[in-house]
């Protein structure tokens, strides 16, 4: 909830580090004072997520926004089912042994 993040950031300032837990809200959260992201997308495209955050911290917001938009199709694919099923599948397809999903 971006409104809640804005309120917390305004109240706490630098006393609290805020991280995005939603890949589709990285740049908006960073713009509100966020420090980074806990990302599902970074499991299959770490450079893309890193470059998006780095561009923002380098004050290249146009590039950060472009990279945020570049992540959207991947986000949609990785959230077509509940996490971690799609991301583990994608990692296995990429040749990274993420193992099988286990039953709860």
Spans of features found by a protein language model:
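Catalytic alpha/beta core domains of metabolic enzymes, predominantly
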Residues: 1-79
């Amino acid at each position: 909830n971006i409104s809640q993040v804005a309120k917390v950031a305004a109240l706490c300032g630098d006393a609290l580090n805020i991280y995005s837990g939603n890949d589709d809200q990285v740049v908006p959260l960073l713009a509100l004072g966020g420090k980074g992201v806990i990302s599902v997308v970074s499991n299959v495209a770490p450079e893309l997520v890193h470059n998006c955050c780095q561009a923002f911290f380098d004050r290249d917001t146009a590039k950060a926004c472009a990279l945020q938009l570049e992540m959207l199709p991947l986000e949609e694919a990785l959230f077509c089912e509940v996490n971690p099923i799609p991301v583990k599948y994608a990692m296995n397809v990429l040749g990274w042994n993420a193992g099988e999903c286990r039953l709860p």
